[in-house]
Amino acid sequence: MRSHYCGHLNKSLVGQTVELCGWVNRRRDLGGLIFIDMRDREGIVQVVVDPDMADVFAVANQLRSEFCIKLTGEVRARPESQVNKEMATGEVELLARSLEIINRSDVLPLDFNQKNSEEQRLKYRYLDLRRPEMSDRIKLRAKASSFVRRFLDTHGFLDIETPVLTKATPEGARDYLVPSRVHKGSFYALPQSPQLFKQLLMMSGFDRYYQIVKCFRDEDLRADRQPEFTQIDIETSFMTAEQVRAVTEKMIREMWLELLNVDLGDFPIMPYSEAMRRFGSDKPDLRNPMELVDVADLLKDVDFKVFSGPANDPKGRVAALCIPGGAALTRKQIDEYTAFVAIYGAKGLAWLKVNDLAAGMEGIQSPVAKFLTEEIIQAIIERTQAQTGDIILFGADSAKVVAEALGALRLKAGKELGITNESAWAPLWVVDFPMFESDDEGNVAAMHHPFTSPLNLSPEQLKANPEEALSNAYDMVLNGYEVGGGSVRIHNAEMQSAVFDILGITPEEQRLKFGFLLDALKFGTPPHAGLAFGLDRLVMLLCGTENIRDVIAFPKTTAAACLMTDAPSLANPAALEELAIAVKLATKDKA
């Protein structure tokens, strides 16, 4: 039906007759001529309809926005005075020779010329995707996927599919369950990742695997999470952690170079402990120059329990965050920051303004200055490298609360005050994570997943001191987002059982849930390691947006609902009966 895309017309085609299919973006009547801006996925071109072409002119008179049309015409150069440098096709226009209305359109429930509500955009997503901004994002996503396949194919990786109907495994979030009609009372789980299957593929001898795969997690959502998401899943045998990082870093660097013409450079490597100490986050945004600075040693003997208490507590921390130019902050703004850190458990936010460094104590403004000697204040200023016009904010609490509160405040202030370089790219690797952490109930949990290998420890050493163990894990971080994470895997049954034991999984549970894995580990399992990237998050960064819904064709809301199809919905009672399922809905307390 078409010979060219609208957005591909240029001066090299002048004089040629082309056939286009697309939509009416806009129609204008000017000086007896009708001008149509015709749009398809590749762009917009201006069409001119001359009244001398009576039949074509009559059809053009009927056109309205979003009519689907087919048009044949001659490409001609625009007069120099009418060249539109804002359009890719701005040097040419199309003189219409024939025009057909394929399908008419009702008035759209969306207005493409103004901002529509998120709810309306999701309800009519098929229309929202017609907008060039959205279309460009989906096309860039396709290019990213294509690049990944080409790169990994070239490097000897095999694209192998793994099951979607599988068994629930503990990976940190709730599973989406699928009832079995044949095995009544039993359920499949949709995979949170292909983790165990890709490890089994390594045991099968496929030493380089990849898959661009849908994964599912029933968890609380936010801007960069969806219940179903796409993962670039990678696993290798006989490669070290350093080699896995090298090949995947190369992939991301070449992707950015091809799609954005940006050279990310070599990725620095930072231990987890350093990231938490300096930035209060295991995914630090290095575009922001501010750092958390420890000052507990200076405050152990001050007559101010807010500082001296945590300073003398082995599990406590007192840290300072110097904000350049922050002395200009109003009391209202400081109060807003105080309320913000309270979200993370902080009980307050002490501050010290350096109004004039040369004026000594006269140039200092702080409600806590009376508790501190001049020597201590000068030592804090020197350590934080504060200058005239800066403000120093303090976090004093448990190490966890201080890191989370000041780490989050660092990001917030960096963005709001223009300190973060939003136009830069700052990648890094974070390595040497703790092997285990405590969950909200105080139970031991794997920081990554229970199949991650410890760093240079035997099973006996791991069991003797699990809280000090580091894992052979690594995360790729870009502009404050974790875009990929992986590890060297456990490749012998003894170590895997030791990890399960530490996690409180009984031998009986181990056999029930992971018997197939423990058995497989006994048959000459090769050392293996891998990594998975969140494709949605990568594309979000490539597109310069802050919400992964912007780069998914048909996303869910933060309530995990599809407004377009009204999913999820109630099931047919007959289908539930066939599955031997009875639905018991919780009733709200009327009291």
Curated annotation (Swiss-Prot):
Segments crossing the lipid bilayer: none
Coiled coil: none
Residues reported to bind ATP: R217, D218, E219, Q226, E482, G534, L535, D536, R537
EC identifiers of the protein: 6.1.1.12
Reactions it catalyzes: tRNA(Asp) + L-aspartate + ATP = L-aspartyl-tRNA(Asp) + AMP + diphosphate
UniProt keyword annotations, A-Z: Aminoacyl-tRNA synthetase, ATP-binding, Cytoplasm, Ligase, Nucleotide-binding, Protein biosynthesis
GO cellular component term, pick one: cytoplasm
Region of interest called Aspartate, as start-end residue ranges on this chain: 195-198
Subcellular location: Cytoplasm
Similarity comment: Belongs to the class-II aminoacyl-tRNA synthetase family. Type 1 subfamily.
Function: Catalyzes the attachment of L-aspartate to tRNA(Asp) in a two-step reaction: L-aspartate is first activated by ATP to form Asp-AMP and then transferred to the acceptor end of tRNA(Asp).
Designated name of the protein: Aspartate--tRNA ligase
Species this protein is from: Vibrio cholerae serotype O1 (strain ATCC 39315 / El Tor Inaba N16961)
Source lineage: Bacteria, Pseudomonadati, Pseudomonadota, Gammaproteobacteria, Vibrionales
